[in-house]
């Protein structure tokens, strides 16, 4: 921390995970939880799925399986209403604003986030400084023809309890988050290879680095 205060670092790379949203990170004692649950902790989504009105699933991770989504997307949309499309219920935490402060001071080279909640964007970060490795709920597109849609389409769908379909080809509209079975965006790998050798400080926040490709 002294190095930050003394402006010794000017090329900082950050790897961020769910802990900066749900309150598991302790960096600078800055965390005030946004209210969004994480996935794998003792209090996370996968171990507490019975709290949500989701049909029984043998494996909770199938909610985020690309091929299962195309066959039966109802569990995802039920959960998405509770977690992501909440009419502005969730807000950035001080950790998110800490990252934005680094950016404002010209010290931040890149943030690689595992989060899909879009709170980094709400705090003021944006591409190309922000790399959303697992995608974002802030955008959406048709799974079939890739037509992009207004990001409010999923919010309208969950409010009306409907599944959104593409007006062009009839395919399902899906938030632009990376499901199991999908590739990460190319920009993630390009920036990792470029940024890491040139960084003078790496900060890991809110992640155990156990999820591919962060480990």
Predicted regions and their residues:
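Conserved catalytic core of sirtuin-type NAD+-dependent deacylases
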Residues: 1-215
